[in-house]
């Protein structure tokens, strides 16, 4: 039995692959530990999964010259010292990083103690921590060809409960969610943080879209996952909204079309389920979401946030919601982008790092 520390946090895109990999490692008999921050989504999801969880302060790299850049080295080395103590106390044998705020101190601590580490990059464009750390890693796993020049294509690990849900009966899934089992489902979500702009334009577009679909005898309903920051109640026929959903397996199994951000985990999950999508990439960061779906025109429509409007959404939605054959072709194309057994593939890299 090996002792493995998984470092990642901040967004679901870092945390969900961590949880999926932890499942596989536990089945193989490894002792797994997780490192994150107390502020990110991992502070809720990881402890609920039964994994020993350690936190360090959130420490984003300052992108602009300011007093924060002067303090950064001291705070960074303080975090490295904290991670070192965790690695020593729990006799960690390999560190696995998924990027994000906690990965860089974890990599640095591993190097200082001569502990091998593995880098996993889910995005088409890596963040700074993974970009630098990949040069010294024992193994590097990627989800998009070319993301890191030394990377092996392994895919983005998906939680076991979600992969199992890919075979659910969509009608039963709709009933589990309290939805109409006859109407097709448009699922809308803006990533783990939600998106005020997507929420606003979607609510403006839906009344006309649903009305015209009904008139043409294309019967649809909407499940809108708005995010915790949204507090607007909307009374609209065939429209349901929730701030967060724990049972995403049922939601994805029931969905006939999705409107969402283009985070790496979201894209991997939709491809696994074969769901046609309208992606609205998050425009900030280092542009990774745009890159994540730039090669997927056959499986999705892509709207850049600068082009997002009520009229554009109405046009895209109506075109897809009234064309069953096109959605079916997009579904088939999406499945071709899915990488099966990504968690097992990544676990194999860890075994390689442990044995070398």
Curated annotation (Swiss-Prot):
Keyword terms of this UniProt record: Cell cycle, Cell division, Cell membrane, Cell shape, Cell wall biogenesis/degradation, Glycosyltransferase, Membrane, Peptidoglycan synthesis, Transferase
Gene Ontology cellular component list: plasma membrane
Chain segments annotated as transmembrane: none
Top-level taxon in the UniProt lineage: Bacteria
Alphabetical list of PANTHER family matching this protein: GLYCOSYLTRANSFERASE, UDP-N-ACETYLGLUCOSAMINE--N-ACETYLMURAMYL-(PENTAPEPTIDE) PYROPHOSPHORYL-UNDECAPRENOL N-ACETYLGLUCOSAMINE TRANSFERASE 1
Job description of the protein: Cell wall formation. Catalyzes the transfer of a GlcNAc subunit on undecaprenyl-pyrophosphoryl-MurNAc-pentapeptide (lipid intermediate I) to form undecaprenyl-pyrophosphoryl-MurNAc-(pentapeptide)GlcNAc (lipid intermediate II).
Main location class: membrane
Pfam families listed in its UniProt record: Glyco_tran_28_C (PF04101), Glyco_transf_28 (PF03033)
SUPFAM superfamilies (alphabetical): UDP-Glycosyltransferase/glycogen phosphorylase
GO biological process: one example: cell division
GO MF term list: UDP-N-acetyl-D-glucosamine:N-acetylmuramoyl-L-alanyl-D-glutamyl-meso-2,6-diaminopimelyl-D-alanyl-D-alanine-diphosphoundecaprenol 4-beta-N-acetylglucosaminlytransferase activity; undecaprenyldiphospho-muramoylpentapeptide beta-N-acetylglucosaminyltransferase activity
Keyword Cell wall biogenesis/degradation found: yes
Similarity annotation: Belongs to the glycosyltransferase 28 family. MurG subfamily.
Uppermost EC category: transferase
Organism of derivation: Tropheryma whipplei (strain Twist)
E.C. code: 2.4.1.227
Compartmental location: Cell membrane
Name the UniProt record assigns to this protein: UDP-N-acetylglucosamine--N-acetylmuramyl-(pentapeptide) pyrophosphoryl-undecaprenol N-acetylglucosamine transferase
